[in-house]
């Protein structure tokens, strides 16, 4: 393929499809993580393209913390039914039994129990040797230095000092029994690339990304949407209706919205062209401590 004849987005698309096909051919039991966000929607679209007109030859896995936005779960189930892919949903039973939540256990412990430990449980349960993730290098500094093929040991931990060289488009997927690879087909995409691709390819996304009047409270410098009656107000907090949207989606008590009037894809793209902050600023889990994302990744987080 003549790369010079391809547009920037088509080059990114071709690279991602190449990676997805490479993993499907090279590994015995791959899985695609599906977190329901914009990056997952793009990755799903690329996987469908990679194997069209056939079906995606591996399942999608959602590690459900039980605290996702209701609209996310509705979108997940609707999308799985529409496209007919195999969807696996895992909730950490131990976390559920102890009533783990962002309010009772704090953001760091909740994320470790319900996301990191839940993910490791699911990977062990199904014996996956490769797992696709939608992380991008422009999101956060620890992700910026991670390879496309990210080696994980038998405990699913990551050692950033023990990464394999990736020369040109040659990836080393050699693993021993019990070891695995996390694969990031969107590594070289930016947030703006994602939104432009969604617009050009007409990819469906969770409506929470579009601005609308929503009930929010201001907490710890973030606008937190009140998604259900489990959200307990602190003294002095008042629920307000504001026009907001989300740049990133996670557990609703830990995800901050931004005030915006961008209720169309073109409006979002216009905002991205002048944005000066990272989308991850809206994630409370990234502010637990200095280097918190790298620490979480070392422990097995995506």
UniProtKB/Swiss-Prot annotation:
It catalyses: sulfate + ATP + H(+) = adenosine 5'-phosphosulfate + diphosphate. One of its GO terms (biological process) is sulfate assimilation. Coiled coil: none annotated. GO terms for molecular function: ATP binding; sulfate adenylyltransferase (ATP) activity. InterPro entries: PAPS_reduct_dom (IPR002500), Rossmann-like_a/b/a_fold (IPR014729), SO4_adenylTrfase_ssu (IPR011784), Sulfate_adenylyltrnsfr_sub2 (IPR050128). Its EC number is 2.7.7.4. The keyword Nucleotidyltransferase applies. It holds the Pfam family PAPS_reduct. CDD domains: Sulfate_adenylyltransferase_2. Pathway: Sulfur metabolism; hydrogen sulfide biosynthesis; sulfite from sulfate: step 1/3. Belongs to the PAPS reductase family. CysD subfamily. Heterodimer composed of CysD, the smaller subunit, and CysN. This is Sulfate adenylyltransferase subunit 2. It comes from Vibrio vulnificus (strain YJ016). The lineage of its organism: Bacteria, Pseudomonadati, Pseudomonadota, Gammaproteobacteria, Vibrionales.
């Amino acid at each position: 393929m003549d790369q010079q004849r391809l547009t920037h987005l088509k080059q990114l698309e071709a690279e991602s499809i190449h990676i997805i096909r490479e993993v499907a051919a090279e590994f015995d039991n791959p899985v695609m993580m599906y977190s329901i966000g914009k990056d997952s929607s793009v990755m799903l679209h690329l996987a469908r393209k990679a194997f069209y007109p056939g079906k995606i030859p591996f399942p999608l896995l959602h590690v459900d913390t039980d605290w996702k936005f209701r609209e996310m779960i509705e979108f997940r189930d609707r999308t799985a039914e529409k496209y007919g892919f195999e969807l696996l949903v895992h909730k950490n039973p131990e976390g559920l039994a102890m009533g783990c939540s962002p309010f009772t256990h704090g953001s760091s412990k909740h994320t470790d129990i319900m996301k990191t430990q839940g993910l490791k449980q699911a990977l062990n349960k199904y014996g996956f040797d490769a797992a696709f993730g939608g992380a991008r290098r422009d999101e956060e500094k620890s992700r910026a230095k991670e390879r496309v093929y990210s080696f994980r040991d038998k405990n699913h931990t990551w050692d950033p000092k023990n990464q394999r060289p990736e020369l040109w488009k040659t990836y080393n997927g050699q693993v021993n029994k019990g070891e695995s690879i996390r694969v990031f087909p969107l590594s070289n995409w930016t947030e703006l690339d994602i939104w432009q691709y969604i617009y050009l390819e007409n990819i469906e996304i969770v409506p929470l990304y579009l601005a609308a009047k929503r009930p929010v409270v201001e907490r710890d410098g973030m606008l937190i949407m009140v998604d259900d009656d489990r959200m307990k107000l602190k003294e002095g907090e008042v629920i307000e209706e504001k026009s907001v949207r989300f740049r990133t989606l996670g557990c609703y008590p830990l995800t901050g919205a931004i005030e915006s009037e961008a209720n169309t894809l073109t409006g979002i793209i216009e905002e991205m062209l002048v944005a000066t902050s990272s989308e991850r600023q809206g994630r409370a889990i990234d502010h637990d401590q200095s280097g918190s994302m790298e620490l979480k990744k070392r422990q097995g987080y995506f």
